[in-house]
């Protein structure tokens, strides 16, 4: 793994920390039934039927995914090359799901949650980082 690839994985780990903090906060608020302070219409989004899957908060599922990405990105940074594939196998679906959830906010709920958008931005950033790392690896061949 080149120095650039390690830096990309380190940045991915940092982005995963941001996503984990965000989704962890939303999960705790959801489970406690607390109000989320937000400048946008978070209550409409977080109170919608799309906020949980089978009683499990979507943010909680995201938090678990961010823990997986964080762990794999750290392992990749430490030289475990196969961990890069784990990062990619989580980051790409996370970005796709996030795009779907943005669609739900825009066209079904007609409200946006800044915290949810932050998580989506983190997921999309992770996917871009993974694709960048992949392109660097291909170019090195």
Task: Outline where the language-model segments fall.
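Membrane-interfacial helix-loop segments of redox and metal-homeostasis proteins
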Residues: 1-141
